[in-house]
Amino acid sequence: MLDSLTQKNKKDLHIYVVFSIITIFVFLLLAYFSFGSLINYKNDIVSSFYNKTSDPIKTSATSVTKQLILIIIDGLSYADSDKLPALKEFKTKSVYSKIEILQPTLSITSWMTFMTGAAPEIHGFVSPLGEKIKYEPCENIFTSAKSRTFKTAVFGHPDWKKAFGGHIDVSYYAGFKPDNTDIIQIDSQIMSNAMSHIRYQKPEFSVIHLPGLDKTSHLFGRAGHEFKVHLQKLDDILKTFLTSSLVNDRYVIITSDHGHVVKGGHGGGEPDVTGTLFMLAGPDVIAESNIKFLQIDQTDICPTICSLLGIPIPYLNGGSFLARLFSFPDYIKILKMKAVLSQKSLYFKNYVLASGGRPPNIFNYEAYAFEIEKNAGENYAQTLVGLETYEKKAGIEFKNLKDEGNFYKKLYRFFYLSFILAAFLAFLVYKFKNRYRLFSALAQIVIFYSIYYGIYFFRGFSFSLSDFNDYAYFDSFMNNRRIEAVCALLLSYTPLLMNCFFMHKRLYTWLNYVFFPVFIEFNFYLSFTLAAQCAYYIFSFGPVLTNSLPEMSSALKYYFDIQLMILTQAVSLLIAAAAYFVLAAAAPRKSGDGIYKSSEIL
């Protein structure tokens, strides 16, 4: 078998084929488990107390409002919010700021963070919903309100029903038609129904979700005429609501779940995608032109809503009550801050215990609060500052403990990955010593990456979840990238093929003494470079996601590298087979004694 090859080529090709098949199998498994751990992600540390609920006495304070309305404008970037005169006018009556949406910047991910106060790595909803919800969400504003028999309402896209439907009392859902002919009208329908229901049924907590602008951005981008027309229509809708009597004596929060890149798309960490507007108006709100002295996080929205309504703070909340935005007395702010701190300290303790650690004394909230109030006496302002300082210190300590646990995992991964890569590199150095062939193989690798990444970046992509615009386009997006990878791989052989014409050797000789040696070396070193890139990701985040999320651009790059490894190895096996058939056809005839004639070899 393979008699047309030299003995060295035959041996090396056998080694490469076995290596390639094993590599394809291993990386297929890696792709399956890595991708699956993201799609089906659930924090394994939090899972033991994921469904716990907060103590309704310790984690809630007296209500300061009868009704609160949260408006989520789907897909509105902070930069585009300035193009809405209705919001500009509303700024004079509200406090507003730019907030950063946590990654991945998907709608369901942001909604869960708004409703639970938990970061995505805690609440676990980091992929599109699909046909049904993967598991019941943790304690959230809707369940907390229900525990106090408060009426809740949602007016928006049907995905809200999938996520929270069983805990919502009043609802109106409007989905898009298959031909998308109702994009402009859908926001108007939702707002009209919301205003009618809120006016007559008076739910304590209402969510108005306007999904139309997001769909327009996906289809046409943010620079087109369609987007401008939709902004004008959206401005009219918001003006109708914000000038109505519904905003009187009610708290109103306006925000967005994410923005869009200019060409349309979200999910990544681009400034236009993560930067959104936060506006708050209502009784006792300190209306200013802008908030420059206070950092507002996305997780702060949930505990602020719960504190205003006087309902329990969700158990996994990691945000803070935005006390500085309100003018009501300090003693009321203190009561609400203590409710949040009671919840957070218990959550921090349970997280550390579940991760196998020992909670530090700083998580003993009651003792710290007692000391703060004792030292401040009746100076409520001093007590408020003391509680804010304690909350920051406890939050920093909690973050440090989580980072410390990840550090030891990274150290372990560093040792075993370094050993594997070092052994692989030592094998390559020992096996392939011919400088000319090494130079040819490395030059081919440079050509391959230059062509592949050149095409990718030329098309305006940047290893972001925003690149493929919508999850529905993910498969077609990846198929196009696979085609580009195959083209880049085939084109990288161009210099090697040109060598065949310049050397003026018989095809048989060139294949045996130039092509196959360089081909084998190229594929081994290409595999090493891809393995090294995958190893860096695994070192940083692990082969599967268990209790933390990666930076999403790194995760997408890792997925691409796995795909490249599998694809290049599979295509290279086909190239090797095709090259051998050509070699066998071009092989010189043997003489009667079984010896090749030198004239036919050369």
Which residues does each PLM region occupy?
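Histidine-centered active-site microenvironments of extracellular/periplasmic hydrolases
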Residues: 256-286, 334-336, 464-469
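Phosphate/adenylate-binding glycine loop and adjacent helical scaffold
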Residues: 327-419
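Substrate-binding rim/cap in mid-to-C-terminal beta-strand-loop elements of soluble/periplasmic
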Residues: 109-116, 268-313
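A long, amphipathic alpha-helix that forms part
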Residues: 13, 20-23, 32, 36-39, ...
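N-terminal secretory/membrane-targeting segments
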Residues: 2-66, 584-602
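Alpha-helical transmembrane segments of integral membrane proteins
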Residues: 404-602
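Active-site-proximal alpha/beta segments of enzymes that process anionic O-linked groups
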Residues: 51, 64-202, 301-303, 307, ...
